[in-house]
Amino acid sequence: LIFFGFLSIYLFLKYKKLNQRNDDRSYILLAFSLIFATFAFSVKWTGLLFLGIISLAILADFLKKFCRYARSRETGKFKTAFLKILMLIFIPLLTYYSVILLHLGILYKSGTGNAFMSSAFQKTLSGNNIGENVTPSSDIEKFIELNKTIYASQATTTGTHPDASKWYQWPLDKKPVWYWSKSDSQKSANIYFVGN
């Protein structure tokens, strides 16, 4: 998540630098920036922050150029600004869809983790016990169902942990992040990440 996210920001900044010189190669950097931001989101939905930062920068740039080009009636330059908006929509969608399809291709066997999915979804998994009368889900149906289930699971989680931090405490590093623990009868060892 962190690697993909910061790589996307780095590539976006490189794109901005090339784009100021009107270099067409900047679009390749923008595309890779969006791909890596989507990879960060694919790892964990909090990675959406990286895509959000890039999106806000692109939208602000688009609005600035839209106002300038609308007054001057330079349609050619408006088309390039509009292309960035299309890239902002389609590259993340196609990347995220591809990552989920890869995920579903790797995890193709039935097990205890799929009990919360529909029988049509489970029917697509190897080793399922679903009857013959159930029609298997298509890839797009599985994609939609998986994302709805992930969202519902996260939205309805009410449990807390005594060491949990509030969202506004994250940038301030008020509480450490617990990475690893090992103990035996006489000793215990822990690894925490504590900010500066």
Mark where each language-model region is.
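Hydrophobic alpha-helical membrane-interfacial segments at the cytosolic entry of transmembrane helices
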Residues: 31, 35-36, 51-54, 69-103, ...
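Transmembrane-embedded, aromatic-rich helix segments that form part
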Residues: 2-3, 31-32, 46-64
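Membrane-interface transmembrane helices that cradle and orient dolichyl/undecaprenyl
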Residues: 8-29, 40, 58-69
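Membrane-interface anchor segments at the N-terminal boundary of transmembrane helices
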Residues: 165, 177-196
